[in-house]
Amino acid sequence: MAGDELKGKKRKYRDSHSGDEKSVKILPLSESSLPPLVTTISGFYPPENTRFQLLKKSNQSNRDASLIGRTERVQFEAKNQSTATVEANYCLAVADKTGRVKKIVPAKYLNTFERNILALQEKDKFLKKKHGTVSGTVMEQRANLGLAFGTRKSQKAIMEESANRVKAETLGDVKDQLVSNVQKATEALPTQEDIAAAQAQDRPIPPVNVGAESIEDAYKLEDIIPKEEFSAIYIKPLLENPDERNWAKLLPYRHSLFINERFQRLLSIEEVDQKRARILYYISLLQAFLFSRRSVGNRETLRKKLADPPEILIDGLIKRFTQTTGIGSVQVSSREVDKIICYILVLCLIVDNYSTDVLTLANDLNVKTMKANELFRTVGCRIMAYTETQRMALGLNKTDAKNHKRAVLKIPLEFPKPRRGRARN
């Protein structure tokens, strides 16, 4: 039963393709007409705009036809070097848009494709004219003997070896053309600055100018806190309450040692720096948002936990530090958590003139010191020990100073290099 089905399938296949076989036309070729010429190219390709011309003497057959093309420096020649009395026949298939073959056209295959440096050709002509023809090397003589008396297999191997042979002087003369091609191919490649900028975009950090020439230009305040939001921060009630017990209650997050120390210091000055006060308030808002992130789906609850800030500030937090899940809910992912912390770190660096204590902020943000060091490096900082003068100014003893490091932002910024996987054996 299976054999009958198989035979039936074969008959159906032959019947379905019988029409195709009848539709194929084989075009005859007379001795006088020239067929399409086909060759194979390996190695250095001629430029696309190279024009080739047919070279064929009137008293020669189509077998001896060749193609020659030239650029300013190189001559390309495709020809037939076969010594066989009987040659293989080649043809080209002409297909329609569906891929169905409609015509078969006889073609001529040129089995060698050579490149010659025009400058070397002129030099060879000059030497031959001056010294006469010089006999070839032993290898060339052996190759000539092989072509004359060798088997078809050896003749084919000799011709392939000759076609693919690379000469040192040839490479020396075409190097300019190769370099030009490489330059064109690499024009679209990104520069080191482009790569650094792209890597910065992949990091959970505020917008950064990796090529900044001054530390103030590395992180612009308006890129971290938009101007509309910055101007919406209302700090007058805070400034009117010099008592810490009063103004601390007005902050979105009350338990930050960093904020409380600097706000107290700020209020002790006769003329308060309102810009710095607004930055401290926004740092406190980010800290409150960080610890209230699980309430981000309920705006009313979130507003209460953030101490009722202006709506534009809540909108900005949700826009920059949340993402929408597949079911339409809003959440703060682990990457967004790192992003919030990085924004806080950069703002703290701005407040502390780009050098701040790592341990203080690690405790404020409830992260391990190692994690804080990692995120400081992510924003471009260097982790450094305190100098003896700095230690004494901070009132730290030598034992405590071992646990305290400072994160310093310097130009040029230094970012961690991308991690690479281990090489496989």
Curated annotation (Swiss-Prot):
It comes from the Eukaryota. It comes from Schizosaccharomyces pombe (strain 972 / ATCC 24843) (Fission yeast). The keyword Cell membrane does not apply. One of its GO terms (biological process) is RNA polymerase I preinitiation complex assembly. It is found in: Nucleus, Nucleolus. Residues 1-26 are annotated as: Disordered. Its main location: nucleus. Component of the RNA polymerase I (Pol I) complex consisting of 14 subunits. InterPro entries: RNA_pol-assoc_fac_A49-like (IPR009668). This is DNA-directed RNA polymerase I subunit rpa49. DNA-dependent RNA polymerase catalyzes the transcription of DNA into RNA using the four ribonucleoside triphosphates as substrates. Component of RNA polymerase I which synthesizes ribosomal RNA precursors. GO terms for cellular component: nucleolus; nucleus; RNA polymerase I complex. Keywords: DNA-directed RNA polymerase, Nucleus, Transcription. The keyword Nucleus applies. Residues 15-24 have a biased composition (Basic and acidic residues).
